[in-house]
């Protein structure tokens, strides 16, 4: 039986302070980015580890128009559990605000952010046009100070040490108090469905602020396990062929797979891996298409191998690895990008994803 996809959305609009310097704007943006990341991780943890009364929940702060930004809370509740689901999410947000924004967590996030800044700085002369376009869009549409990409990267690098729990809580206090400029939206196909009204949602917001949520308990062990605790069966290259046109090599592996390898100096010390095969959605029966549509969204949300998401995140902390999957109409693929220093764990991650 299909689960009705009703949804409840709570929105709040608020005015953004005037930024007189690039540093003020970048610091505000960093606080917002780290806050959104903490909220997303904690809500995902709650869905995986607790008796959640909702199928999904997203919450975060985003730009709206010039001088304004807003908080969006979108909840897909279990059927008939709209009020209970909203109460759960709002109480979890209150718990996050009180206990999840810590110096330790922000140190983890800022360390990972530095890795991204190093990557961006390495390709500064090869930035795509879309990056420069966004600089002008942010200036003219959002009122951000106009600055070169290098200036933004440098400002972010030097401001990361100032992003601690006090800074993020100060940013949070700027907009979180009060209920002005709130909008509620309920979505569903049945006009007779008993959705919660605005009075009920406002009451739930106020009750959540007055609640007494429990602090978080650190469940991850002090000594983290290795990502891969076994040695996979080794393959071998049985044939090598030089491809003159693209200046690459074609390797045939012992399992019949073809590998195309090309070295370049586009980003020194970085590598990209793409694996694909024909097939895709076109080979799936109709009843499996809804699950296929959710594949990209749910990828790694519940962990990998024998590790739940929270432990997996702890194991991968500090490693600069990006893995994505794509299920097209007639093909499927998985891509991995990383650096020389993280090559071994990147290939372990890739192996566990595909086997």
Predicted regions and their residues:
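C-terminal regions of mature proteins
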Residues: 107-244, 248-252
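Short, solvent-exposed polar/charged micro-motifs at secondary-structure junctions
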Residues: 1, 192-197, 335-337
